Amino acid sequence: MEQKQTGSKAYLISIVMVAVLGGLLFGYDTAVISGAEKGLQAFFMGAEDFTYTDFWHGFTSSSALIGCIIGSALSGVMASNWGRKRSLIFAGVMFFISAWGSMCPESLVLPKGAPNLTLLIVFNLYRVIGGIGVGLASAVCPMYIGEIAPSNIRGMLVSWNQFAIIFGQLVVYFVNFFILGDHIAPAIQSVGNGMNQILNGGEAAWAIETGWRYMFGSEMIPAGLFALLICFVPETPRYLAMVGQDAKAERILARINGAEEAKKILNDIKNTVTEKKEKMLTYGVLCIFVGVMLSVFQQAVGINAVLYYAPRIYEAMGFDNPMVLTVFNGIVNLGFTCVAIFTVEKLGRKPLLIIGSLGMALGAIGVAITFGNPNLQLLCMVSIMVYSASFMFSWGPICWVLIAEVFPNTIRGAAVAIAVAFQWIFNWIVSTSFVPMANSLGYWFTYGLYGVICILAAIFVWKLVPETKGKTLEDMTKLWKKN
């Protein structure tokens, strides 16, 4: 049977749309805590066998990040041994188990509705399981899309994974808002009283005892859909060539690129995958340092302190309905992510990172100056928006693009795993430290610190990060060899 000479764009798009569901789940899982954390706090404050301190609250709000570190660290080994597709199926299963377990941490064993230390530990274990799914998806989804997509549109398609992450965060902001509904105000007012408010019944009781369960449980829908649909997409041609399944790899390439082009691409892939593996420091320490520090700065600028605690921050500013502002912030984030998608190949990576760093510094310092002043409430909100929007067109998407591009071919798999693991480690550090630092040192100090780090990030990019716009991956190998 004669193969088509032109590829099927519809087939490619359908594959990518399934793959970016992993990105959507990445965003959904990491942002669901923003609406649930105050309910969780009030619920566990009623425990009699331990005291739910700021430390416990910070740990519970960020426990999924422990799993993210584990999942990202294992991503290279799993993707190489299991394949990209099976790794993503596993991630989908982890998402589903975590959503169900976080909704019902009692799991028919512990008494429902009775807060205690054992229940808190079980809840956090389920969040760690979800984090493993996030860590895997954060590394393998861009890898899968990059290996399945034609080279002329690869950058654009990989960027849509970041769009899906932000879209997932926006979706869960809406979900959280509609789950709470009229229960929002009573729930916020009751946090200081913990379970005392629950004992009186009413709207606060539902929000604190049940609302957060629905938020986590809602993730079962996209998680189940992703785990099911990913079963029907092909493995990547690059992985198939690595394990000697050339015929199958060529058939997939032909469906995407056409038969004639498929033969050329397969030859290039085979030349790449048969190259001798090199040691991590073959290209020097600077190469690894740049990749790792890109990940560190992406988190150290403090963006997840906004994403995870947005309702709490807006409430502390004095706004009556913080969930509405959180949803609006999500819409702004989505729009500015599109700015990056449409400008990264025109302006380059470094200019966007430097401009974004300075914009974040301006926004963070603005928050530090205006926070707590009722006369500057609107200016404080605008500063938060500037801070968040600046991240979304710079460090949010561009960091992932650079991490995928900056490492030489022969060390990319291991180097990306290390860089992404550092990203999740610092994500955990920032999100765990935010509440204790803000409560003890003040929001002004916390955001002032983030502003200083943003300025340091701009200097780092200016001095050390190479521009990868218009360069092939082989050019990066030559660059690091030269240096």
Regions found by a protein language model. Give the residues of each.
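Short helix/loop segments within enzyme catalytic domains
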Residues: I256-G258
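Short, well-structured alpha-helical segments
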Residues: A262-N271
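Alpha-helical transmembrane bundle of multi-pass membrane proteins
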Residues: M1-K248, I252-A254, N271-N483
